[in-house]
UniProtKB/Swiss-Prot annotation:
The lineage of its organism: Eukaryota, Metazoa, Chordata, Craniata, Vertebrata. Chondroitin sulfate-, heparin- and hyaluronan-binding protein. May serve to form a basic macromolecular scaffold comprising the insoluble interphotoreceptor matrix. Glycans are attached at residues 143, 203, 212, 756, 780, 794, 812. It comes from Gallus gallus. PROSITE patterns: SEA. Residues 231-356, 735-848 form the SEA domain. GO terms for cellular component: extracellular region; interphotoreceptor matrix; photoreceptor inner segment; photoreceptor outer segment. Pfam families: SEA. Highly glycosylated (N- and O-linked carbohydrates and sialic acid). InterPro entries: IMPG (IPR039861), SEA_dom (IPR000082), SEA_dom_sf (IPR036364). This is Interphotoreceptor matrix proteoglycan 1. Residues 26-50, 164-191, 441-481, 494-522 are annotated as: Disordered.
Amino acid sequence: MHLKTGLIFLAICLALQVQGSREIPSKTNHGEAKQLADASGSDKTERTTKRSRVSTIRRIFDMAKHRTKRSPFFSTGVKICPQESVKQILASHQAYYRLRVCQEAVWEAFRIFLDRIPDTSEYQNWVTACQRETFCIFDIGKNFSNSQEHLEIIQRRVKHRTFQERKDEISTDKTGGKKLEDIPSVSTGPPSASLSTYTLVPNGTLLNEIVNETKTPVKELGTNTVPELPAEQMVEFSVTLTDQEYTAELSDPNSPQYRQLAAKFQLQMQKIFEKLPGFKEIHVLGFKQKKEKDGSSSTIARYMVNFERDGSEIKSTADDISTIGSNKVENEKVPLSAKEEREISATKLTVTDLQQLVATALHEDRSLPVDLGTLRFTDEPIKPSSDFDNDIQGMVTIPLAGPDLDDTISAELPLVYPSPITVDQTRDIFVDEFTTGITDLSREIGGPEDFDSNFITSEPAFPTKPSREPPHDRSPDTEDITTDYQRFTVPFSALVSTDSPAKPEDSYLPPPADESDSNDLITDESPTEQVITPAVYTTGSFTLPTFLQATDKDTEAEMKKELVGVTEPLFKEADRDSLSGQAVKMMDELESSGDDILVTTSTYKTLPFLIGSSDLFATQPEVTFAAALPPDQTLLPTVTSPFYSHSVVIDQSPEVPDTLMPAAASALPDRASTGVQDIAAELDGAGVKSTAVLDEAEHGSGYISVQTTEPAEVTQAPTLKYVTTSSMTTAAKGKELVVFFSLRVTNMHFSDDLFNRSSQEYKALEQQFMQLLLPYLQSNLTGFKQLEILNFRNGSVIVNSKMKFARTVPYNITEAVHCVLEDFCDAAAQHLNLEIDSYSLDIEPADQADPCKFMACDEFSKCIMNEWTKEADCLCKPGYASQDGLPCRSLCEMEPHLCDNGGKCELVPGRGAVCRSPDQFTEPGLTS
């Protein structure tokens, strides 16, 4: 029994041992399995993650590789719709091509020239303008390259050559790569807009393909050890000394006269500029010679003023006037009082501000013997795009190297923009004497389309109109060309050929015209008598072309019968044997340049030419011109009727010496007894077609009046019409956009000197408005080209002006100009002490404006407008004349001794000035 119990117990123990031994490996295997499972799971996760990561990168690469191009409207490739005709398919393909090209051109223009992404509206406006063929692709590039924003970017990057570097710059020893330079962000938008910093993208990569690009914050950028601006700011200017004649000693800085004059003016200038903030010192750079018209020479002094400043570039308050990006003034700024503006340190002023301070100080102190109208600054920060080469000249250089140049000879040339053909302005040349036949007329005159090619002009920095200046101001000096009149125009003379040597200072040689223009003139060739005729240059007033038509000889008897009751009065004995010079004013160009030529006619059978249309006709080509008045004796512009034998004609110029007309005096027989009949014969011969018949009351009044006709228009002048929308304004092909405007300054008093264009007050006020308005308009109006101050009129001071733009601008020109000028009025009132009445702004585009309205002619003059050029000017009424730009005055007042032998000068309305003898009889003496 015990044995059985022991065996059972032993069996149980063995069973327990076997069971325990089995459980231990099971647990071990289970743990290992669990560990293996965990390991395999992690490997699987790692492999899955890796595979997922690789797939994402590959997927991004594949997407970039096979990414479709941007196409907002059409898909790429040749797509054909079944319902379209072949013509429609071609048109749609061309339209799509134009769209894609314009999109890429505009996009690249913004990226290359402005280095920024365009706004949706401006991008769409440019694309639309390109699609309408308003601009070609290269014109878009030129427009962007000449924009103020692009020029400012270039100026800043040329000025600051050193780029800032990152603090977290990667070492070349660790990476073996190149140093990474942070490209400076340039804000080219309006002042009120904040643009994010854009970094350059590698070529071939689109901006919207960059994902998760990290940028270095602005705070991490290292501080540039080189100051952004110099410690001193220099302002250089030149001005003409009024009572100082130039001598050879002034060209030598070591001469006693040079030192004495320099010390004198340096001390005077220093007293004026001491009150300016930040003023340090002033230096006299030198003296230049300026030759006047009368042969005398004046002295131009060049100064340089130094102002102290720090190295930080701070935006000044004057930026509200000179740089307004979006045609708006930041009205949030609190306007500064005059006292606070005085306390502003020069360290916070830009070059423009300092120039304004210098100009203001010189205008306030009138003690200096200088001509403030000739004040000129150099290196101005804001200039027209055509003059930008002067601003960067000497700073950007291109090494000139090539196979033909040695390394030792290689030079550096300044980077300049291509400029138009310029004319040597060393002296004004005017043809003194000329002789012509009608057959030569065809080679000299072309149609209206040809006149543009007969002018060679240089682009002005400040547009002027030289034709309105007196003759003595029109001659630049020969050695140092001054900038008093920066626009030089060589007029195309229609009837000019030289027959004797001309004086260099009084003659000009026009450019030859193409002989193909002879098709515009139909002539009957016949021999022409050639008589030397000196040209007379006047103070220029615009006149309409005159049509002289030969009359039938059958009317001679009728004219004699009408005039038989008029007897001959008493005149000087010398006048019976010689002809008084009579001036006939001819317009030798269709455009109103004011370059009028006065010639006198002695005897001619007919004057058969018409100027003023595209086709010129001549039927009686026998023309003879006789001698005219010397240039130095002609003071007034003159237009008179055809000559009369044995009579005195009231001329608007001094008496003609008998020596000037020997041929004319000897050519006519003495027929004193038939003087009245000769008048009728000459009237028939001259063929003057009158527009008005003499009233019956005039037959017994002792006045005989002759009128020339208005020009006969052969070809109707083209109508001027601008295409204006909310987003663009376009002129006709070959035309410019012109806008007239006037504004009224209420805190200025008008003086009579502002009528005279040659007065110092007029020039000073004109220059002041040019310096204020020109930079403001350039920086705010795209396509702006030229500003011209037309005149000043009474009413406080009313400034009438004219602006010229490119043929197309991407905005409504009337609304844009009105907005810009309103902002200018507000800014001028806050910072320039100019009270401009914004409600008085009158802005009219040329296609809607009346140019005569802005000329503001007085009661003794009338406005004449050229129908082709739409240019207007004031012309004195018959019997009145203007001298030195002053308002028109009566000839009887200007020349008290106009009539001889006790005759009385009277003005006949609409007829002119006549001399009435004491016995109530008079010869015709009509002038206009």
